[in-house]
Amino acid sequence: MKICAISDLHGHLPNIPECDVLCIAGDVVELVVQRDSDESDKWWSVTFVNWVDKLPCKKVIVVPGNHDIYIERLYDGLDKDITLQQFKDKISILTDDKVVFLIDELYEYEGVTFYGTPWIAPIHWQKWAFEDTNHEYDEYKCPYENIPECDILITHENPNYNEKLEHCCFGKYKHHFFGHWHNGISYGHLNQYNCSILTDSYIERERLKIVTINLEEHDN
């Protein structure tokens, strides 16, 4: 199975190589609409869906990030017009079942297991989505403790900047995709991949190279 991975799109919707699965590790929505629920819903339902329709892959797996504020509002049940499940179903229908959202969930596709979790350490500047409010106050509460063994782990947070995530995911994945810190470090020998397509200045990288792996049958 050929798998590509990107993160930190912030509304930039790149071309990708032909593959079986595209994984998106958070911060998908455009910056100018991220705090407007109506405009965010429209962006997901029209702009994102139209892009997905043209992608040369069979499945798109999305894990939200801290800028995907509308998704967290749905997760928290704060939107009176639509639930998270209804939103997921809508995007699935509009993309002919091509898109799957994962929030602390395990998903299996063609024998390969994917687990996604969006949580990050608190930023302490403005209010952002999926901030782990227990991060600094209770070492025994952790949103990452339910990470299971899986083939592909997708997190928005970078484990090299979050000791809880690093501890909880160690040895549980074959490949780990993440972003959040646009120019953050990753270690190829650990099968870690920083998938951000933007620089710290929110500019698309020159000569962008999409993270791509080939998962062979004997790797499963």
Locate the predicted segments by residue.
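Active-site-proximal beta-strand elements of phosphoester/diester hydrolases
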Residues: 1-10, 23-25, 111-121, 151-156, ...
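Conserved beta-sheet core of the metallophosphoesterase superfamily
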Residues: 59-63, 158-220
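Short aromatic-enriched loop/helix-cap "lid" or pocket-rim segments at secondary-structure transitions
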Residues: 16-18, 72-76, 126-128, 188-190, ...
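Catalytic metal-binding/acid-base residues of hydrolase active sites
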Residues: 10, 28-29, 66-68, 106, ...
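Active-site-proximal loop/helix segment associated with metal-binding centers of metalloenzymes
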Residues: 32-36, 74-89, 112-161
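Core catalytic region of metal-dependent phosphoesterases/phosphodiesterases
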Residues: 6-109, 168-170
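Structural motif
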Residues: 109-110, 213
